UniProtKB/Swiss-Prot annotation:
Lineage of the species this protein comes from: Eukaryota, Fungi, Dikarya, Ascomycota, Pezizomycotina
GO biological process: anaerobic respiration; nitrate assimilation; nitric oxide biosynthetic process
Protein name as catalogued: Nitrate reductase [NADPH]
Gene giving rise to this polypeptide: niaD
UniProt catalytic activity: nitrite + NADP(+) + H2O = nitrate + NADPH + H(+)
Single Gene Ontology MF annotation: FAD binding
Length: 873
């Protein structure tokens, strides 16, 4: 007989549907199909936002505190504890389902869901836009069990051997649920794809640093019913939760999780794979000889579609024995039951799981439980979707294995090895295939066994919450994890020496002069700025004019121990220049006295200071407000020491911010320079516009911006300044490294948050009616929403009217169809058109990404501009 289950109450419901009673929307089901169908385990939806998330863009998302965060507080990338995941059984409750987010979770309100739209366009006869309501009402709904696996599952093992570009996942980056929704093929058929169509490109609503997340799969896969590719709006009978794509997502069984796009907004039918940034630079297995540097220097590695990952490979892991589990041999039963999971990709079935206790010389077969097969005998609907597994032979889910092992054999073994094979006879390899993103890691899973005086200790390869895995211990002990013997030394083999960290030598060869505190202070003036880094004394006089940050950057360090900010801010290139300025070593007693003096910078005066910033000491401001400008850009408002205090920052200059490094184990700090956007005469507070560079698999993320993003309101941020060699005085008068000159016009070239220093100059010009300086701004961005301070720029241009005092030109590389402005990068044509003929009375101000600055400089010099008329903030 057929059965319908539409909504199950998950209080004390048994995990299988047999002949027991279950209440379903006031309807009693007393007799069910004889099939034994796994139902979702009891689920408790989180209702409170965790304190960690309250100051992030995900402040609207309640979460389960048991999930293990892998990339700091934000973005949210988590896996459940492995044992807790396995104990839930075949299906995973949504609150424990692993999460891979590249950025903020779109905030979708209940009232927005009926009107959520999905656009199907591209190589189709009839482009259409479907509402969420139409997707539910006009298409057949299917319910199917599907396991999703992150391509980075078990990546920490690769990172232990050699750091990849991806963050570390343990062996729990997978979960299984009953997904409900229409088949993707039915949706696509409504738009009638053209004959030359080959791919389905998908795009989500998440707004990320490199545009919306998008990827593609082959169209013939989407149209193949046996592959089961679908759109889902339910998960285990519940509406999708925010972290899992609420209200609509793609689900691609048998392929890596990165192809199952969340918060789905577009299906674009094309004749080529997606050109989305995340499709190209994520989810690839590059050849093992390609290093991170090689992949950064040669983008062609990423654009080779042969290296893109689609189907999952065969993989397995042991859950029991657990990591750090112990077994008392005297009290143990005769047999120990080892357990774990295995999965394969492309709809292929796991056909065997094998266990070895003698380094792979011999193997024994484990039992395999295929819980997915129980749905093949069920006819009916679950949660509003028809279960159509009866005809389908493809396998979409993980399987569980187990094996009873004599404890005496465990006691005589040094490791338990696990490997699996699928029906294509693909077998897990013994050794790791390292790659630059660390994805698809699937060597034999090894649980180390140590007999400690009659007690067995079991250890997994890595520990996702620490460094207690056997791989981490072997590496620390000098073992070679690539030696084919799991890093363990053969008899007579010498330990591998750890590669030493190469420090740049900042001392001049042959300099032996010892300097005491009296001599150091005597020679530490604005004209002759001596300063200390790592106990060594440097004379910055010769670099006062040439320093990119201006003379003030060096003058501010005069007479101080500048080690912290110098080492935090400066590159290896800058450090290599230091021997030219090295003059001696500060004696030990003087260094201790100097550092004590550096620490004691508190103004003992009880009178309020009129000016906040001081060039030689850090002063404390309080973070009082965060205002979101876009999903990844915020205005941070800092309150000064009192409401009538001036910041003390000249127009065009910068201040340094210092905040604790949340990832440092030694109370380290992060220091960066910023230009505020608040008016220079604003009292009591300062506004700073900052773009948050979140971590991605191929980009480590902004160290300072991610730290600032996690700070709660009320946090103290230290400030110092001013710095910079450029200052705009008024009415065409500028200071360059302290020397005054006059200009009649500015050409301002900027991109992203690089707009902030040139904006300060532009505002100073526009707010002074007597200032006749002409300004042309070329502002380059990716999308319309990336244009910062646009309202203010529009006001300045309107204020100028026909006087040609202000002209703003925006150019976008990824502008939408409705964008009517210029498209493309800031190139030679644009600069030639708007910069005019080079002359002594025009100055070019540039600030933006390093690549843009380098490209613009090359263009400007080729057009005849002299370096003295170019300023790079």
């Amino acid at each position: 007989m057929s059965t319908t289950v539409t909504q199950v109450r998950t209080g004390s419901i048994p995990k299988t549907l047999k002949t027991s009673q279950i209440r379903v929307e006031e309807q009693e089901i007393t007799e069910l199909d004889t099939a034994d169908i796994p139902l979702p385990p009891p689920s408790k939806e989180p209702t409170e936002v965790l304190s960690l998330d309250k100051t992030t863009p995900d402040s609207h998302v309640p979460r389960d505190p048991r999930l293990i965060r892998l990339t700091g507080v934000h973005p949210f990338n988590v896996e459940p504890p492995l044992t807790a995941l396995f104990q839930q059984g075949f299906l995973t409750p949504p609150e424990l389902f692993y999460v891979r987010n590249h950025g903020p979770v779109p905030h979708v309100r209940d009232e927005d869901i009926p009107n959520w739209e999905l656009r199907i366009e591209g190589l189709v006869e009839k482009p259409i836009t479907l509402s969420f309501k139409q997707i539910l009402q006009n298409y057949d709904q299917i319910t199917a069990p599907i396991t999703l696996v992150c391509a980075g599952n078990r990546r920490k093992e690769q990172n232990t051997v050699r750091k990849s570009k991806g963050f570390s996942w343990g062996s729990a980056a997978l979960s299984t649920a009953l997904f409900t929704g229409p088949m993707m093929a039915d949706i696509i058929k409504s738009a009638k794809p053209l004959r030359r169509a080959k791919y389905v490109c998908m795009e989500g609503a998440d707004n990320l640093p490199n545009g919306n997340y998008g990827t593609s799969i082959k169209l013939n896969w989407a149209m193949d019913p046996n592959r089961g590719i679908m759109l889902a709006h339910k998960m285990n009978g519940e509406d999708l939760r925010p972290d899992h794509g609420r209200p609509l997502r793609a689900v691609v069984p048998g392929q890596i999780g990165g192809r199952s796009v969340k918060w789905l907004k577009k299906l674009i039918i094309t004749d080529a794979p997606s050109d989305n940034w995340y499709h190209i630079y994520d989810n690839r297995v590059l050849p093992t000889m390609v290093t991170p540097d090689m992949s950064s220097q040669n983008p062609s590695w990423w654009r080779d579609e042969r290296y893109a990952i689609y189907d999952l490979n065969v993989n397995s892991a042991a859950v029991y024995p657990q990591h750090k589990e112990t077994l008392d041999l005297a009290a143990a039963r005769p047999f120990y039951t080892a357990k774990g999971y295995a999965y394969a990709g492309g709809g292929r079935r796991i056909t065997r799981v094998e266990i070895s206790l003698d380094k792979g010389k011999s193997w024994r077969l484990a039992r395999i439980e295929y819980a997915e097969d129980k749905y093949r005998d069920f006819e009916g609907t679950l949660y509003g979707g028809r279960v159509d597994m009866a005809w389908r032979e493809a396998c979409f889910c993980w399987s569980f294995w187990s094996l009873d092992i004599p404890v005496s054999e465990l006691a005589s073994s040094d490791a338990l090895l696990v490997r699996a094979m699928d029906e294509a006879l693909s077998l897990q390899p013994k050794d790791m295939y390292w790659s630059v993103l660390g994805m698809m890691n699937n060597p034999w899973f090894r649980v180390k066994i140590t007999n400690e005086n009659g007690r067995l200790l079991f250890e997994h390869p890595t520990d996702i919450t620490g460094s207690s895995g056997w791989m981490e211990q072997i590496k620390k002990a000098g073992g070679d994890l690539t030696n084919g013997n799991w890093g363990e030394r053969q008899e007579g083999e010498e330990p591998v020496e750890a590669e030493p960290v190469v420090e740049v030598n900042m001392k001049k060869e042959g300099v032996t002069r010892i300097i005491d505190l009296e001599e150091f202070k005597k020679n530490s003036s604005d004209e002759r700025p001596w300063f200390v880094v790592n106990g060594e004394v440097y004379d910055g006089t010769a670099f006062l004019e040439g320093h990119p940050g201006g003379a003030q950057s060096i003058i501010s360090a005069a007479g101080t121990d500048a080690s912290e900010e110098f080492l935090e801010i400066h590159s290896e290139t800058a450090k290599k220049m230091m021997p030219d300025y090295h003059i001696g070593t500060l004696d030990k007693a003087s260094l201790e006295a100097l550092r004590k003096g550096n620490a004691d910078t508190t103004d003992s005066s009880s009178d309020p200071r009129p000016t906040f910033l001081t060039p030689k000491a850090w002063t404390k401001a309080t973070l009082t407000k965060k205002t979101s400008v876009s999903s990844d850009t915020h205005i941070f408002t800092l309150s000064l020491e009192h409401p009538s205090q001036a910041l003390g920052l000249p127009t065009g200059q910068h201040l340094m911010l210092k905040t604790p490094d949340p990832k440092s184990s030694s109370s380290g700090s992060i220091i960066r320079s910023y230009t505020p956007i608040s008016p220079s005469d604003q009292l009591g507070m300062v506004d700073i516009l900052i773009k948050i560079y979140a971590e991605t698999p191929s980009i480590p993320g902004g160290k300072m911006t991610t730290a600032l993003d996690t700070l709660p309101l009320g946090s103290v941020i230290e400030c110092k300044g001013p710095t910079g060699r450029f200052e705009y005085l008024d009415r065409g008068r500028v200071l360059i490294s302290g020397k005054e000159r006059f200009v009649k016009s500015f050409v301002m070239i900027c991109g992203g948050t690089g707009i902030t220093p040139v904006f300060q100059v532009l505002r100073a010009v526009m707010q002074d009616e007597q200032d006749e300086t002409k300004c042309v701004m070329l502002d380059g961005n990716r999308l319309e929403e990336d244009i910062l301070l646009k309202n203010e720029l529009d006001e300045f241009e309107a204020l100028a009217g026909k006087k040609e005092k202000c002209k703003i030109v925006h150019t976008l590389t990824k502008g939408s169809e409705s964008w009517t402005g210029r498209r493309g990068r800031i190139d030679e044509e644009l600069i030639r058109q708007h910069a005019g003929t080079p002359d002594r009375e025009t100055m070019v101000l540039v600030c933006g990404p390093e690549a843009m600055e380098k490209a613009s400089k090359k263009i400007l010099l080729s057009l005849g501009w002299k370096e003295e008329n170019l300023h790079y903030f």
